[in-house]
């Protein structure tokens, strides 16, 4: 039921299930503007442990009144009224959050009102701008609001050129150099992470391309494609008489076929030494040999020779890099095969379900 717990501030307080309209207020909250807000100690103590400690202290009598006096100073009177009303009925309007969000955040932290602090953290975070982000960040650090701190840091990172032109940033540079250093360090770390992610994506794309190239080499040497087939001899110009149509990875496969044709007829190719294109082909064949697990029956040229030779690089650093490359390409190939297998299985299941539905429909007709 509704209760009347204010006299001059015009803020009505609501309580659910319990009626306090017949209970006399025993606490008087005084604001900076000397506004008096009557309240019930039972309500205040049930929500805020800080107010509980204040209420339990020996009572001081003021002007013959037996009410406990609690002073909440340093914030607007209306903000205190909204704060007290929240203790009775946990609700804050958008307009109140717009006007008193930062004040309510400070009050919720000081008086340990967790529910209000969570709402203020979210509400204030939604209202961050280039002009107020520095002030909100400082308040968030004082109020131990890590989520709001992180949001402000990210905002400054994304719009740093705009933020550094504001008065808040200039004030920060003059009066809080340690916070400025923390912000710049956060921006530097974020940029470093972004560069690492970009490099990782480029590397993953490279491994996927090499994995696709390995599959295309096996496809060319086993099944054949438009230009080169399994009956081709890399040491002469002969090609398959029957040429199949383009495969699903034709863009990669076509380039490899041209590379294989060149490798077969290049006059500079002598014991692995030759032009750049020949060296590239040798590297691809060597990479295939390193990840191939069927070298005895493999139809890719030089696969068995490279496997048996077990060649070693002259430098250990190069050998280590090569091993890492082989391992990651093999992993990318395995993941690609797994995804393709799942896709094929789903297509088969979908086809079977469709056939079952057609069969059932035909029976019903």
UniProtKB/Swiss-Prot annotation:
Predominant location of this chain?
Answer: nucleus
Disulfide bond sites: none
| This protein's pathway | Protein modification; protein ubiquitination
Residue interval(s) of motif Nuclear localization signal: 193-202
What InterPro entries would the database entry show? BT1/2/3/4/5 (IPR044513), BTB/POZ_dom (IPR000210), SKP1/BTB/POZ_sf (IPR011333), TAZ_dom_sf (IPR035898), Znf_TAZ (IPR000197)
Q: Where in the cell is it found?
A: Nucleus; Cytoplasm
A Gene Ontology molecular function term of the record: zinc ion binding
**Coiled coil feature spans:** none
Stretches annotated zinc finger (TAZ-type): 205-304
Keyword Plastid on this protein?
Answer: no
Q: Which residues form the BTB domain?
A: 25-96
| Keyword Transferase assigned | no
Reported induction? Up-regulated by auxin (IAA). Down-regulated by salicylic acid (SA) and hydrogen peroxide.
Gene Ontology cellular-component terms for this entry are: cytoplasm; nucleus
Keywords in alphabetical order: Cytoplasm, Metal-binding, Nucleus, Ubl conjugation pathway, Zinc, Zinc-finger
Tell me the Gene Ontology biological-process terms attached to this UniProt entry.
embryo sac development; pollen development; protein ubiquitination; regulation of DNA-templated transcription; response to auxin; response to hydrogen peroxide; response to salicylic acid
UniProt comment concerning the protein's domains: The BTB/POZ domain mediates the interaction with some component of ubiquitin ligase complexes.
Q: How does it assemble?
A: Interacts with CUL3A. Interacts with GTE9/BET9 and GTE11/BET10 through the BTB domain.
Biological role: May act as a substrate-specific adapter of an E3 ubiquitin-protein ligase complex (CUL3-RBX1-BTB) which mediates the ubiquitination and subsequent proteasomal degradation of target proteins. Also targeted for degradation by the 26S proteasome pathway. May be involved in gametophyte development.
Q: Mind telling me what this protein is named? A: BTB/POZ and TAZ domain-containing protein 1
């Amino acid at each position: 039921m509704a209760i009347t717990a204010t006299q001059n501030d015009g803020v009505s307080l609501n309580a659910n299930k319990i009626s306090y309209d017949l209970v006399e207020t025993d606490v008087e909250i005084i604001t900076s503007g000397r506004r008096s807000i009557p309240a019930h100690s039972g309500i205040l103590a049930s929500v805020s442990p800080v107010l509980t400690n204040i209420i339990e202290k020996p009572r001081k009598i003021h002007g013959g009144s037996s009410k406990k006096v609690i002073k909440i100073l340093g914030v607007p009177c209306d903000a205190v009224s909204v704060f007290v009303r929240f203790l009775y009925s946990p609700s804050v309007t958008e307009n109140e959050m717009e006007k008193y969000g930062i004040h309510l955040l400070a009050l919720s932290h000081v008086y340990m009102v967790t529910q209000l602090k969570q709402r203020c953290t979210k509400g204030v975070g939604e209202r961050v701008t280039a002009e107020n982000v520095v002030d909100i960040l400082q308040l968030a650090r004082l109020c131990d609001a890590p989520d709001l701190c992180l949001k402000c840091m990210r905002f400054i990172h994304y719009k740093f050129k705009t933020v550094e032109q504001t008065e808040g940033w200039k004030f920060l540079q003059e009066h809080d150099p340690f916070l400025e250093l923390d912000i710049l360090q956060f921006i530097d770390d974020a940029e470093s992470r972004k560069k690492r992610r970009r490099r990782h994506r480029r590397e993953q794309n490279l491994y996927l391309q090499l994995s696709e190239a390995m599959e295309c080499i096996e496809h060319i040497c086993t099944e054949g494609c438009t230009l080169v087939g399994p009956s081709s001899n890399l040491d002469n110009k002969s090609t398959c008489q029957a040429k199949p149509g383009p495969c699903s990875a034709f863009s990669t496969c076509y380039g490899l076929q041209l590379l294989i044709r060149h490798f077969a007829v290049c006059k500079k190719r002598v014991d692995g030494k030759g032009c750049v294109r020949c060296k590239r082909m040798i590297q691809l064949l060597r990479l295939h040999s390193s990840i191939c697990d069927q070298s005895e029956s493999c139809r890719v040229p030089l696969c068995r020779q490279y496997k048996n030779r077990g060649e070693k690089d002259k430098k250990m650093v190069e050998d280590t890099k090569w091993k890492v490359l082989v391992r990651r390409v093999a992993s990318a190939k395995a993941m690609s095969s797994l995804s393709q297998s799942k896709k094929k299985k789903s297509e088969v299941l979908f086809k079977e379900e469709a056939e079952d539905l057609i069969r059932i429909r035909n029976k019903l007709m």
